């Protein structure tokens, strides 16, 4: 998170950086929401559904997709689109599994809690995305933004 310029007003807008920052914000929100509401039985988690082909990519050129492909290939250097059902699996698990009762502030991928990030793979969760101080800071900035 670039807290001093969340909206890219003072730096060059790069779509993939903005996307990555929004994904980090999702995880930070889960951390802070669980801290605030977990005592009331409300937990929040973040997840990565995987690469599901959808209309979200309609404005992304094939060149841009190819450029990012290296970041989302598997350990064998292969790239596969998930089906919508495969992409939904982690969401369904988080929403319905009794095994996750009371578990919050975490990041999941492929129906499992994500491990530490693995550079160059697009897998795992970076430590800064789970930082409770950053989560609180983002929460406060969000409140200020909503109040204005």
Question: Can you say where each PLM-predicted feature lies in the sequence?
Answer:
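Short glycine/proline- and charge-enriched loop/turn segments
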Residues: 4-12, 65-72, 117-126
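C-lobe helix-loop cap of protein kinase catalytic domains
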Residues: 30, 92-96, 143
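C-terminal helical subdomain
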Residues: 22, 70-123, 130-137
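Non-catalytic terminal and boundary segments that flank Rossmann-like NAD(P)-dependent oxidoreductase
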Residues: 1, 126-148
């Amino acid at each position: 998170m670039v807290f001093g310029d969340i909206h890219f007003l003072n730096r060059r807008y790069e779509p993939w950086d903005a996307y990555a920052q929004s994904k980090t914000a999702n995880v930070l929100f889960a951390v802070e929401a669980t801290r605030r509401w977990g005592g009331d039985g409300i937990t929040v988690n973040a997840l990565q559904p995987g690469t599901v082909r959808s209309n979200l990519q309609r404005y992304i050129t094939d060149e841009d997709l190819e450029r990012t492909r290296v970041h989302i290939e598997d350990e064998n250097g292969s790239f596969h689109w998930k089906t919508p059902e495969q992409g939904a699996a982690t969401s369904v698990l988080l929403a319905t599994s009794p095994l996750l009762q009371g578990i919050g502030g975490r990041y999941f991928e492929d129906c499992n809690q994500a491990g530490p990030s693995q550079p160059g793979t697009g897998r795992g969760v970076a430590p800064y995305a789970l930082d409770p101080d950053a989560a609180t800071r983002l929460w406060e900035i969000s409140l200020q933004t909503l109040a204005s």
